[in-house]
């Protein structure tokens, strides 16, 4: 599941935990 795939963007909590999608 990519956060930069149009799902919350890099502002999502999952992104902060896996900040490597952006």
Swiss-Prot record:
Belongs to the conotoxin M superfamily. Keywords: Amidation, Disulfide bond, Ion channel impairing toxin, Neurotoxin, Secreted, Toxin, Voltage-gated sodium channel impairing toxin. One of its GO terms (molecular function) is sodium channel inhibitor activity. Expressed by the venom duct. Disulfide bonds join 3-15, 4-21, 10-22. Negative results: does not show activity on hNav1.5/SCN5A and hNav1.8/SCN10A (tested at 1 uM). The cysteine framework is III (CC-C-C-CC). One of its GO terms (cellular component) is extracellular region. Signal peptide: none annotated. The keyword Disulfide bond applies. It is found in: Secreted. Its main location: secreted. It comes from Conus striolatus (Cone snail). The modification Cysteine amide is found at residue 22. This is Mu-conotoxin SxIIIC. It comes from the Eukaryota. Mu-conotoxins block voltage-gated sodium channels (Nav). This toxin potently inhibits hNav1.4/SCN4A (IC(50)=15.11 nM). It also displays lower activities on other human subtypes (Nav1.1/SCN1A; IC(50)=132 nM, Nav1.2/SCN2A; IC(50)=363.8, Nav1.3/SCN3A; IC(50)=89.4, Nav1.6/SCN3A; IC(50)=124.9, Nav1.7/SCN7A; IC(50)=152.2). At Nav1.7/SCN9A, it does not elicit change in channel voltage-dependence of fast inactivation or activation, suggesting it acts as a pore blocker. Interestingly, it blocks current inhibition in an irreversible manner (tested during 35 minutes).
């Amino acid at each position: 599941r990519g956060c930069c795939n149009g799902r919350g963007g890099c502002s999502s909590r999952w992104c902060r935990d896996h900040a490597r999608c952006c």
